[in-house]
Amino acid sequence: MVLAVAIGSLLAYPAAATSTSSVCDPDGVQPGGAIYRICMPSGSWNGDLVIYAHGYVPYNVEPLAIPENQLRLPNGTSLPELVNSLGFAFAATSYRTNGLAVKDGVEDLVELVDVFIYTATHGVPNHIYLTGVSEGGLITTLAIEQRPDVFDGGLAACGPIGDFHKQIDYFGDFRVLFDYFFPNLLQGDPISVPQSLIDNWPTYYATTIRPAILDPASADKVDQLLRVSNAPYISGVTSTIETSIYDALMYNVLATNDGIAKLGGQPFDNQGRVYTGSNDDAHLNLTVRRFSADQAALDEIEAHYQTTGQLTVPLVTLHTTLDQQVPYWHEPLYRVKVILNDSLALHQHNEVFRYGHCYFEAGEVLVAFLQLVSMVIEPPEPFPSPRQFLPMMAAGP
């Protein structure tokens, strides 16, 4: 009933019928160095603020800026215009750094609230809704858990919220497996990537890697790679196979060195991993390269990158079931944390049966957001979380 009322009230705004629903201030600079943008409805403002946390931007992208390509849904819908058309104010930040920006990102989002209130002089919003995608989904979840005094609720989409260390291992495992099936094709190794490869990644992929994986003679090796790595794809749809391979290798190439620097050590560890699904698992496990994580990196991840599932304000999550970058298994892992903290009443998850990373339709995003609004307007009563299915849910990837 509350959701129906929320939908009705949001759609009542006359600005929703216009295509010029946003009035954006010139971008500014936050005290910590991040770039911020604030967009207000061209019509009446409902007094609420939506803050957007964007996804990963490679560390070597310059200058620091809000990623414009992440301000639109796959169908071209503008997020600021969609939010403003419903009467909400919209604010976004670049974060103060590119690359791995999780720890700084939480601080930048809190700082952005102060910028909205005091620097832009819009005053204190009635409610502040935090939304984020991909890396921004993790930042959103951490901020909701850690700063309920600032944010009234959050929508975290396609983020690595279940286990950040497992996310790192997902990319690392894919790289060591790729090197096993396609030896000497990629320069460097899974934990040390040459700068020349980073600088020329798109060209190197197009001229060297892509022809190798699309060669009909490589079909069996590609099949084994996908089976062993558990990378999502749609059987028989070549474009999804190539996308899954490209994305996993891209993150290894572009994110590894930056991640090691910011985590204070090397986080990938496959010493005890048993790989299965190849034509010869015994040979694979005997000969695949093994790496050990640095304890300093693991400690940093545990301290600043792992979610707890302890909620005191609502969190709605949204994820495609065949997400090739941030696998869907993050959602049941996070759900286990929520159950263990008796926070189930404050967590609503929406699964989208589709291939692709953050590949949502506007209606799916809007429904998830309206669920969040309804939970904030009328907070659900807490209840003890059922634990009988925890062993099965905790199995993970």
Go through each PLM region and give its residues.
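Gly/Ser-rich "nucleophile elbow"/oxyanion-hole loop immediately N-terminal to the catalytic nucleophile
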Residues: 43-46, 112-134, 150
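Conserved alpha/beta-hydrolase "acid-adjacent" motif
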Residues: 324-330
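N-terminal cap/lid segment of alpha/beta-hydrolase-fold proteins
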Residues: 18-45, 283-292
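Accessory cap/linker subdomain of secreted extracellular hydrolases
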Residues: 160-306
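Histidine-bearing beta->alpha loop at or near hydrolase active sites
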Residues: 346-361
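Primarily recognizes the serine-hydrolase "nucleophile elbow" in alpha/beta-hydrolase
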Residues: 126-182
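Short beta-strand element of the alpha/beta-hydrolase
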Residues: 47-57
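Short beta-strand/loop motif that positions the catalytic acidic residue
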Residues: 317-319
